[in-house]
């Protein structure tokens, strides 16, 4: 094998390791959050050594940033909601669509759902890595929440009020997504399927309409 061929094999091997680390990190961070997701567990799932994390990403923060970048891209590509669609609906319909989209991880276990779980973890355990990321690239869940709440608030509403309402709405689905496994156990014993998802959307929409001043 020539030196060039050896370099190509090494390059492919390095890229395979890099992709495996990002995939493993996504599942670990979705399950345990940034703080609870250890590099040791990530490398075990990726079948790589811990030095590979430093080599490819410069450390845990760099790896997490790559996961967040992938999450943002995936949510943009897979979202069935867009700002224009929200604007075309009535305020109540826009609210329901928003809630349903971000509650879907309760009944789906695809990669997009894992990304939403990561964002849900950040709602209670914000990491410095995430804070630095959202300054440059605010997650879609906040953009869409702001779009929805502005449909209910007066045009002259202070920016602070809009921000309060946006954060409040964004956190409605996050709680259920983040704590789904705990809520499925006693004493709550909630069952999450398509039918219960619709009932949850109905309930949260009803509460949210009252909270947004539109009973």
Q: At which residue positions do the language-model features occur?
A:
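N-terminal intrinsically disordered/low-complexity leader segments
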Residues: 1-16
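An amphipathic alpha-helix adjacent to DNA-recognition modules
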Residues: 15-23, 56-84, 131, 135
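Helix-turn-helix
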Residues: 20, 28-62, 66, 70
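Amphipathic alpha-helical packing segments from all-alpha helical-bundle domains
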Residues: 76, 93, 127-153, 202, ...
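Hydrophobic alpha-helical connector segments
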Residues: 80-115, 162-169
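Amphipathic alpha-helical segments used for helix-helix packing
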Residues: 110-132, 180-186
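Hydrophobic alpha-helical segments that form the core
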Residues: 115-121, 158-180, 199-210
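Hydrophobic alpha-helical bundle segments that form small-molecule/ligand-binding pockets
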Residues: 138-163, 186, 212-215
